[in-house]
A protein has these predicted regions:
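A structural signal for multi-pass alpha-helical bundles of membrane permease subunits
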Residues: 4-295
Length: 295
């Protein structure tokens, strides 16, 4: 017999049903398809053949550029996420204070994050141009340098520039996530700490950081996913040149699939990247949760 109690029991699931269907269609189903394709033979024309086991994975791992790409991806994620997190906390602490023009500074800070990554990378490409780049022009006009500097003289320096642009566009996201956590902290905690003789660093380590940890955890996990999957910066600035020396996993599998037409290994590489990303994000969340629980 139908009763209001039964309706209340199922009502939350009915409200969630549209979201669940969208996630299933656009997230879960494509993931299942990619996993299936990674174990299938795929021709250069994209024709799907039979089951080949782990052959695609073997070919992907044995490719000459695989080790370089994996190391680049590691340093790309570590440097961009790590440095942007530190700088984001610094900017959040600054913006949490009251000062004249704070709203203007906040608007300026959010601009790099809100602008298209392709535009950002293109602008930075122009700034560091050897012949007519703005950076060389400014330094020459100020008399700081006597002749133009080649800011992209090696692939190592180009990779550093990629990381720098990644940090530049990511800092605002971290800053505003942490700022939201800072603004939820009760001011009386700082007043009590001041009365007890606590200094700036004592308040930071014992009050601020522990209380903004939930916001920081969310921003870090999202940042890892966002940076790992970032395609426009690397592709716009270098396209992985020379010889995949500045490639990350995302740009490499794109080139592998659409330029070299090796769709099987590219699919396997995408699965490897997905599993690595899940492992890193999961490990970070578990570590943080254990610290919060005091285990």
């Amino acid at each position: 017999m139908y009763s209001p109690l039964n309706r209340n029991k199922w009502e939350p699931y009915l409200w969630l049903l549209p979201s669940i269907l969208l996630i299933a269609i656009f997230v879960i189903f494509p993931i299942i398809i990619v996993f299936k394709l990674s174990f299938s033979e795929i021709s250069k024309a994209g024709v799907i053949g039979g089951f080949v086991g782990f052959q695609n994975y073997k070919e992907a791992v044995q490719m000459p550029a695989f080790k370089t790409v994996m190391l680049n991806t590691f340093w790309w994620v570590i440097s961009v996420v790590g440095i942007s997190t530190v700088l984001g906390i610094v900017f959040a602490l600054m913006l949490d204070r009251k000062f004249h023009g704070r709203k203007i500074v906040r608007a300026i800070l959010v601009f790099p994050w809100a602008t298209s990554l392709v535009i950002q990378a293109s602008v930075w490409n122009y700034i560091i141009k050897y012949e007519y780049g703005n950076l060389n022009n400014v330094l020459l006009n100020l008399g700081i340098i006597k002749q133009a500097i080649n800011w992209r003289s090696s692939y190592q320096i180009e990779f550093i520039w990629e990381c720098g642009v990644g940090i530049f566009v990511t800092v605002p996201f971290v800053a505003f996530c942490v700022l939201s956590g800072l603004q939820s902290i009760d001011g009386t905690l700082y007043e009590a700490a001041t009365v007890d003789g606590a200094g700036f660093w004592d308040k930071l380590w014992k009050i601020t950081l522990p209380l903004v940890r939930p916001s920081l955890t969310v921003s870090t996990v999202l940042n890892i996913i966002y940076v790992f999957n970032s395609f426009p910066i690397v592709y716009t600035m270098t396209k992985g040149a020379p010889a995949n020396k500045t490639d990350t996993m995302i740009t490499y599998l794109y080139m592998l699939s659409f330029y070299e037409r090796q769709k099987g290994p590219a699919t396997a590489l995408s699965v490897i990247g997905f599993l690595l990303l899940c492992a890193c994000a999961g490990l970070y969340m578990v570590t943080v949760m254990r610290k919060e629980e005091g285990l």
